[in-house]
Amino acid sequence: HAVTVYDSLVTGHKQAVPNDATLVQADLSDSHALIETLTREKFDAVMHFAAFIEAGDSMKDPGRFFQNNFTNSLGLIENAVRAGVKRFVFSSTAAIFQSSEEPLSEESPLGPTNVYGHTKLMTEQTLEWYRQIHGLHFAALRYFNACGALPGRGEAHQPESHLIPL
């Protein structure tokens, strides 16, 4: 497959984009660039990893998180469907679940405890509606706090925000 990376590079890194991939440097809120890219490329699938991830910050500035994590995701989903995309992979989070002393499973009760988790749950629920209405096939990846990246590979945050720095 040919890969196109659509990234504002606000927190991303150009050097992480493979040489054989096409980079479109634009924000998801730029609907003109987004629509142009989606219609020009005729994608088989969209993999959506863009989001603010700092749960604590989401409680200090919720509007910023709702705008970036949910509203921009909705725009991407809607425009992808309009462009004929049939498959969508969404980078969600385990933060959509209620806090629990028990191990979590796919059947665990939903109940985010912060705005970050809520924006991810809203996006998952939106994808389910687009599946029902438009036939969009999707997968939501519900990560836990990641750790264990190899030196020189993986994520790069300044400042580092994970419990176990990558």
Residue ranges and their predicted role:
Residues D30, L163-L166:
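Alpha-helical structural motif
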